[in-house]
Amino acid sequence: TDLVDARLRGRMHGFDPLDDYVAWIKSNGDGNARITIDFDRIRRFFCDKQVVIDEFHGSGRGYLTRLVGEAGVRYTVLHAQRDPDLPGLDYANPEEPFIQPLKEKVAETGAHLGMGMDTDADRYGIVDKGGIFFRPNQILPMLVRYLGIERGLTGRVIATQTDRKSVV
C-alpha cells in the first residue's frame, strides 16, 4: 500500500505522543502559565479510593489511565481496546443514556468517581460516587468558582458559545 511504501522509503515516520504528553502534563506545561497540578495531593486524596475511566475505544485511550496510574490512583478501565466498530456501545459519546456502563461500573466497584471521554477525547462526562452524571456545562462553572474563590486565581476564562452562560 501507499503507507507501507512511504514508510519503507523514509517519507513517513510514526510516533507515539503518550510519553511526551504525560511528561509535559506532569511538568505542569513547562511554565506556560497553566494551573499547576499537584499530583501528591491527588495521590493523598485518592489513597483509599478508586476511579473508573471509560475510554470508549477511542484515540484518547491510555492517556488518563497513565496519568492517574502514575499519580498512584487505583482505577478500572472500560472500553480500552482500539476498535473502530465500538463493540458494546450504542453511541460513543459520554452523555446519558450512553454513559450507563460507566455509571454501573462506578456502582459495582464502589468507585469515588467515573470519567468518560468520547472517541476523539474532546468531550467528557463525570459520574460521582452516587451515580449522578455531570455534563461539562455543569463541571466547568464549579471549576471556575473553585479556582476563583478557593484558590484566589484571577484572569480570563475562555468559553465556547454553549458554555458562555454557565461560566460568566
Residue ranges and their predicted role:
Residues 56-61, 121-122, 163-164:
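Gly/Ser/Thr-rich loops at beta-strand to alpha-helix junctions
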Residues 1-109:
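Gly/Ser/Thr-enriched, mixed-charge loops and adjacent short helices
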